[in-house]
C-alpha cells in the first residue's frame, strides 16, 4: 500500500522469480479480501515481464489499521503460466505513519510513543524461538508492559513475531543486523544488501513504521549511511528511516558528557 496514492487504493508490485529465464506468458490473478474473507475486488493481468505493477483503486468503506483496531486485509495472488500455477497470500493494512518536528502521527493523529528493545532469544533454546513463543513475546509487550512500539534489537526478527504485531496493533522499528562496528567495503556492501533483503521481506507489514538503516551504536560514516538510506527510500518511499548512533565516537560527542545513544530520523 502506498500512502501517496490514498488510503482507498492498493498499489502492488509483484516480482516473479524466473531463474531458468523461461518465456514469460500467462496471467496473474489478484483477489483482495477483507478481514472476514469477503472478496472486495478481483483483477486479472497478462504476464509480460518479471515485474508486474498494478493498482486496485476506488475502494470504498476501507477501515484503517490502528494500534487499537488493527484491521488487516488479504491479497491473494495466483500466477498461471504454461509451466504451472503458483500462488501467494499477503496480509496488509491501510494506514499512514509519519514522524514530524511536532511528533509522531498515525493516520493523521498524534501518538506518543512508548517503546522497548526486544531480542528474540530465550534460555535453553537461544534464538530458535518457535511460533507460539514469538506470539507470546508480542503479547507481553503489548498487554503486560503496555508499550506501543518495539525495536527489533538489532536484526530483522521472525515473521511470526511481526505477524503477531500486525494482528494486535504493536508498532515496529525494524533494524538491519549489526552492533557497534562498521567493516570494510565488502562488509558495507553486505549490510546494504541486508537493507534490501529486510525491506523486500517485510514491507507488507503495517506494524512496521520505521526502517533501521544504521548499525546499532556505530560511529558516523556519511558515505555508508547515505547508501543505506538511498537503498531504503528507493525500495520503499512510504516509510521513514532511522538509527542509533554512538555518541562517544560521533561528530557531536563534545556536546555530551555520556556515551548514551540517540535516536535519529532521516
PLM regions and their residue ranges:
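Disulfide-stabilized cysteine-rich extracellular repeat microdomains
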Residues: 97, 121, 246, 262-263
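Secreted/periplasmic carbohydrate-active enzymes, especially glycoside hydrolases
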Residues: 5-156, 163-164, 169-172, 194, ...
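Substrate-binding/catalytic cleft of secreted carbohydrate-active enzymes
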Residues: 139, 149-258
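Active-site loop signature of alpha/beta-hydrolase-fold enzymes
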Residues: 119, 179, 263-266
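Single conserved hydrophobic/aromatic residue that forms the stacking wall/gate
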Residues: 1-11, 256-266
Amino acid at each position: 500500500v502506498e500512502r501517496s496514492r490514498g488510503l482507498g487504493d492498493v498499489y502492488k508490485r509483484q516480482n516473479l522469480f524466473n531463474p531458468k529465464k523461461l518465456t514469460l506468458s500467462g496471467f496473474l490473478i489478484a483477489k483482495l479480501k477483507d478481514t472476514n474473507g469477503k472478496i472486495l475486488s478481483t483483477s486479472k493481468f497478462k504476464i509480460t515481464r518479471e515485474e508486474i505493477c498494478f493498482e486496485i483503486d476506488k475502494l470504498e468503506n476501507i477501515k484503517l489499521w490502528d494500534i487499537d483496531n488493527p484491521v488487516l486485509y488479504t491479497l491473494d495472488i495466483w500466477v498461471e503460466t504454461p509451466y504451472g500455477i503458483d500462488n501467494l497470500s499477503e496480509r496488509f493494512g491501510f494506514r499512514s505513519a509519519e514522524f514530524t518536528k511536532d511528533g509522531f502521527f498515525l493516520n493523521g493523529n498524534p501518538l506518543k510513543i512508548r517503546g522497548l528493545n526486544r531480542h528474540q532469544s530465550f534460555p535453553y533454546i537461544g534464538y530458535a524461538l518457535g511460533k507460539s513463543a514469538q506470539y507470546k513475546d508480542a503479547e507481553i509487550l503489548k498487554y503486560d508492559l503496555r508499550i506501543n512500539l518495539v525495536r527489533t534489537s538489532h536484526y530483522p526478527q521472525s515473521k511470526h513475531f511481526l505477524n503477531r504485531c500486525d494482528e494486535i496493533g504493536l508498532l515496529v522499528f525494524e533494524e538491519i543486523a549489526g552492533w557497534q562496528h562498521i567493516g570494510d567495503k565488502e562488509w558495507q556492501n553486505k549490510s546494504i544488501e541486508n537493507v534490501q533483503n529486510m525491506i523486500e521481506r517485510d514491507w507488507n507489514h503495517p506494524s512496521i513504521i520505521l526502517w533501521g538503516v544504521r548499525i546499532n551504536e556505530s560511529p558516523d560514516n556519511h558515505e555508508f549511511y547515505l547508501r543505506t538510506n538511498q537503498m531504503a527510500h528507493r525500495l520503499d518511499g512510504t516509510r521513514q528511516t532511522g538509527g542509533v548512533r554512538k555518541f562517544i565516537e560521533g561528530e557531536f560527542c563534545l556536546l555530551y558528557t555520556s556515551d548514551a545513544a540517540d535516536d535519529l530520523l532521516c
